[in-house]
């Protein structure tokens, strides 16, 4: 009973500390998971009053929030938090990296599981303006590519920056889309009254989405930028 009360007190204090520090409610748990290098599931248990972090993680959590472990435990009343010190600065642009892979290959089965944010990449607003042409940060996400059908343009393991606000065909380009029950990253090109689905790797044949088959096509995003994971070994 005592342990349950301690967990509940910690959960309440944690939420209050996050609010005062200015940590946005949307994405709060994922943000803390990235900062503290723990799993989103562990963070969820803290907020739900199911568990309390170990001493080292409690100290790290308190440091991030600008308070003390004693406050989070409920032993002290003064939180010591500087109001809104974690609120997003207008000088930064954050891009979420999502725990999902798009297939540049034969296709990946679509999962109904909730897609977690696993980390975020920060840019200055000027860097973001140049990279993303003024798109709002909510529209830009990063996912990992698997498969080799786009090799030469996008290689297996590369990360791609995508615009998730584009959910219909928006002119020739590379898209992340679902056809039937599989997810793909391919080049789409309108040819008369049908869409050509093109793999930049010549080993893969192109295929077509004909009139009457459009209902099976669901565009999720348009690809903006590729970030390569290529390594060169010199010793």
Curated annotation (Swiss-Prot):
Keyword tags: DNA-binding, Repressor, Transcription, Transcription regulation
SUPFAM superfamilies assigned: lambda repressor-like DNA-binding domains, LexA/Signal peptidase
Record feature DNA-binding region, as residue ranges: 25-44
GO molecular function, one term: DNA binding
Database matches in Pfam families: HTH_3, Peptidase_S24
Domain HTH cro/C1-type: residue ranges: 14-72
Entry keyword annotation includes Kinase: no
Tree of life domain: Viruses
Protein name: 26 kDa repressor protein
Taxonomic source organism: Escherichia phage HK022 (Bacteriophage HK022)
